[in-house]
Amino acid sequence: MANGPIEKPDAYGADDGWKKAKNALIVREFYKTIKSSGESIYKEKGSRFLGFTRSVNSEQEVKDFIANFRKSHPQSVHVCYAFRLGADMKHFRYSDDGEPSNTAGPPIFGQIQQAGLTNCLVAVVRYYGGVKLGVGGLIQAYRQAAKEAIISSEIVETEDYFLYEIHCDFSDLPQVMNWLKSQKI
């Protein structure tokens, strides 16, 4: 993932806003995300784990997808998931949905991290097969279902442009530059 300042993005055509942005810093950020949703089926000791990926841009979209998964799979016992939002990849959450602590959400999120994805949701719907899998078995099953769903997705590298215009006294410039550097801007 390469981030950095640019001189003139295509999004700001010569006559379309560029003149206004002439003295501003424009930053282009690249990130990987889901273009086309993916699905997987993983079976272990009679249980079925259905993996799904979706492109999302807000927590509300995540909630809506999870509600739809629950409605579409009323006989399932768990709908576990993880998501990450934003080019900075700092906004994320995961849920074990009643499975033993850290046996579902973290393994799913680990696959999102490993793939370097953001603005995506990975959900795994579990149908219980009558045999307990134990902590290690659950971790492996949720991890594998998530991994296979991600592999079946179409992943693209996307770019966003951010325009920053900062006004300050010349004497404050070193502090401003340090802050920008700390924010990786």
PLM feature segments, named:
Residues 118-128:
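Glycine- and acidic-rich phosphate- and metal-coordinating loops
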Residues 141, 145-153:
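Stable alpha-helical structural segments in soluble proteins, enriched in small hydrophobic residues
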Residues 7, 12, 18, 22-103:
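C-terminal regulatory domains involved in ligand/effector binding and gene-expression control
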Residues 100-117:
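Positively charged, aromatic-enriched nucleic acid-contacting surfaces
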Residues 137-139:
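Conserved structured catalytic cores and adjacent interaction surfaces
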Residues 167-185:
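Short amphipathic alpha-helix segments
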Residues 155-170:
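Short glycine-/aliphatic-rich beta-strand segments at the starts of folded cytosolic domains
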